[in-house]
A protein has these predicted regions:
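Non-catalytic cap/lid and distal C-terminal segments of serine-dependent acyl enzymes
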Residues: 1-223
Length: 223
């Protein structure tokens, strides 16, 4: 297993960025050969790539499964393009990051070997960008995703969220539902080919997002 930190100038974000990469380059059995299957893993709200590596057994899983893991930092922006701020976070994680890491590292360029996943806000980012860039990603993994952004505001004790903040990212609540940002709308569309495979999970005690995840699950089952 190899661990890398890469700093480069992002065109989409118009600033320098740091990414963490785990490669299964030296498997004990010598069975993992490049180009590697790749998971782009998105941190949640207020989290960083370092936190995910610290709290999760990503290095071991990379070695066991023979998969590269690429982790950008989150920015509390739900991985959206925000032209008014000249910040294109969706373009960054869904397009630029894939292209840059494929040029730098021995990663597979095949769709069937390229996945996106995330936790909480990162889970929303994975759902949104996995669907948007479905020609790039064949699988989406969403762990306790904030799959309905505006439902977060229904939780009185939810820290760090405000309607003004969400309106700055998604527009009004009325504009959000039925738009491409609404995961129930996007993932149940009938006019879409090449839909990624989806793994969706959430603990029942995760009261911040459980109702939203259940809502998405019900919508998918009705499809």
């Amino acid at each position: 297993m190899a661990f890398l930190q890469i700093d480069y100038k992002s065109e989409a974000l118009m600033r320098g960025v740091n990414i963490k990469v785990i490669l299964p380059s030296d498997g004990m059995a010598g069975k993992w050969e490049p180009p590697y299957k790749t998971l782009y893993l998105l941190p949640g709200y207020s989290a960083t790539a370092t936190e995910l590596i610290t709290y999760l057994g990503l290095r071991g899983q990379s070695e066991l499964k023979g998969i590269a893991i690429v982790l950008p930092d989150g920015e509390n922006l739900f991985y959206q393009d925000l032209p008014d701020r000249m910040t294109f976070y969706s373009t960054y994680v869904g397009k630029e990051l894939v292209e840059v890491t494929r040029k730098m590292l021995p990663l597979s360029t095949k769709r069937e070997d390229t996945f996106i996943g995330g936790i909480s806000m990162g889970g929303y980012g994975a759902l949104y960008n996995g669907f948007k860039y479905r020609d790039t990603f064949s699988k989406v993994v969403a762990f306790s995703p904030a799959s309905d952004a505006y439902m977060l505001l229904a939780e009185e004790d939810a820290p760090g969220f405000s309607r003004k903040q969400f309106e700055g990212i998604f527009g009004s609540k009325e504009a959000y539902y039925g738009s491409e940002c609404d995961m129930c709308t996007q993932w149940t569309r009938k006019d879409v080919d090449n839909r990624p495979e989806l793994f969706l999970c959430c603990g029942k005690d995760d009261r911040l997002v459980y109702d939203a995840v259940e809502k998405l699950e019900n919508a998918l089952q009705k499809e």
